[in-house]
């Protein structure tokens, strides 16, 4: 059994897309903390924040993180999961944390192209490019502090997955169908 692999980074860096591809490449299970949370409370992130505030959402996010953390699982986390010190320590201690790093321009382009963008609550109330820049400035150091590996997420999903697999210890690089020794 291998440690969970946690993907962290801002909105639009590709945590879910890369996570699913990485899980397929490694034979691991895939989990997404935001999706798990939404399916268990039957509300969108925006609805949770509206009803419970960011503090309530962050508490639920921690519960989701603990619930989906399991050996041999790739976990796509919410962009703000690193704001809670407990979450940073937990992920760093329990698993391998990978920061999917991308510049503001890439993040904005991806977010503008997402059909579910309206389901995400604004973090600052500012235009998207300003919000992404501000949020990344506030969180980048926390992503870096938490990560075991920092990966350039501007490439294609296949390239990013290959870079992640190359960075991981050999025991984690087994492809589906390989024999674990």
From Swiss-Prot:
**UniProt: ATP binding residues:** 12-17, 120
- Name the chemical reaction catalysed here: shikimate + ATP = 3-phosphoshikimate + ADP + H(+)
- At the top level of its lineage, which domain of life is listed? Bacteria
Q: Where do the coiled-coil regions begin and end?
A: none
* One Pfam short name: SKI
InterPro entries tied to this protein: P-loop_NTPase (IPR027417), Shikimate/glucono_kinase (IPR031322), Shikimate_kinase/TSH1 (IPR000623), Shikimate_kinase_2 (IPR027544), Shikimate_kinase_CS (IPR023000)
Q: How is the cofactor bound, as the UniProt entry phrases it?
A: Binds 1 Mg(2+) ion per subunit.
What are the record keywords, sorted? Amino-acid biosynthesis, Aromatic amino acid biosynthesis, ATP-binding, Cytoplasm, Kinase, Magnesium, Metal-binding, Nucleotide-binding, Transferase
Q: What is known of its domains?
A: The LID domain closes over the active site upon ATP binding.
Question: NCBIfam families attached here?
Answer: PRK03731.1
**Xref: HAMAP family:** Shikimate_kinase, Shikimate_kinase_2
Tell me the function of this protein: Catalyzes the specific phosphorylation of the 3-hydroxyl group of shikimic acid using ATP as a cosubstrate.
Name of the protein: Shikimate kinase 2
Q: Which gene encodes it?
A: aroL
């Amino acid at each position: 059994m291998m440690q969970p692999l946690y993907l962290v980074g801002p909105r639009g860096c590709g945590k879910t897309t890369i996570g699913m591809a990485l899980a397929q490449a490694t034979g691991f299970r895939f989990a997404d903390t935001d999706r798990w949370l939404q399916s268990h409370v039957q509300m969108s992130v925006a609805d949770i924040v509206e009803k419970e505030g960011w503090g309530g959402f962050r508490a639920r996010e921690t519960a989701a993180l603990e619930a989906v953390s399991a050996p041999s699982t790739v976990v796509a986390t919410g962009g703000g999961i690193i704001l809670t010190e407990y979450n940073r320590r937990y992920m760093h201690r329990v698993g391998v944390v990978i920061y999917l790093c991308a510049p503001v321009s890439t993040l904005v382009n991806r977010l503008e192209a997402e059909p579910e963008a309206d389901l995400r609550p604004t973090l600052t109330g500012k235009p998207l490019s300003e919000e992404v820049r501000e949020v990344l400035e506030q969180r980048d150091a926390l992503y870096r502090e938490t990560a075991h590996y920092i990966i350039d997420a501007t490439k294609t999903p296949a390239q990013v997955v290959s870079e992640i697999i190359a960075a991981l210890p050999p025991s984690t690089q087994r492809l589906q169908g390989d024999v674990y020794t």
